């Protein structure tokens, strides 16, 4: 969830408490935690999120632009913990306003809150549908290729 939002050890403890022994495989990326595979919880400095998001039912992250866009491109609803960074707060608010996920403030970062909000997201077909629709809209916009074409067109 990014450096400084939630301390790595607290994130690990709370996420494990929320999802350990559940039917979900949990992947935590953190260079501040030691690599670990314990039942359904897997920790490493990095993961190939492109591959993981193909199978994901929920993406919990800090609200950075890359995380948010990757989640949407894969049509995955999101649970965002933005901390105090404006960009992340704006992104989290946008996800919630478009019904593609929910926000958790730092003071709400407890296993109970995470589990309750995660269940709400995964049980509401509208949030899943909204995340998928936003992802299709992003793809249709053209991405980096369109920007490059427009730059070339403007320079000619």
Task: Report residues per predicted region.
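Short catalytic-loop micro-motif centered on adjacent basic/acidic residues
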Residues: 1, 79-80, 104
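Donor-nucleotide binding loops and adjacent catalytic segments primarily
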Residues: 1-58
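Residues at alpha-helix caps and immediate loop-helix transition turns in enzyme cores, especially N-
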Residues: 10-11, 91, 143
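A donor-sugar binding/catalytic signature common to diverse glycosyltransferases
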Residues: 46-94
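C-terminal amphipathic helix plus adjacent low-complexity
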Residues: 112-156
């Amino acid at each position: 969830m990014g450096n400084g939002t939630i301390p790595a050890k607290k994130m690990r403890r709370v996420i494990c408490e929320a999802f350990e022994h559940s039917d979900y495989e949990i992947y935590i990326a953190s260079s501040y935690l030691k690599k670990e595979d314990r039942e359904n919880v897997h920790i490493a400095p990095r993961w190939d999120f492109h591959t993981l998001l193909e199978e994901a039912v929920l993406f919990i992250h800090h609200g950075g632009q890359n995380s948010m866009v990757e989640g949407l491109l894969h049509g995955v609803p999101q649970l965002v913990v933005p901390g105090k960074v404006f960009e992340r707060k704006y992104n989290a608010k946008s996800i919630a306003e478009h019904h593609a996920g929910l926000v958790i403030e730092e003071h709400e970062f407890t296993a109970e809150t995470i589990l309750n909000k995660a269940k709400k997201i995964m049980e509401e077909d509208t949030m899943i549908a909204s995340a998928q629709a936003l992802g299709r809209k992003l793809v249709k916009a053209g991405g980096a290729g369109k920007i490059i074409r427009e730059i070339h067109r403007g320079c000619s």
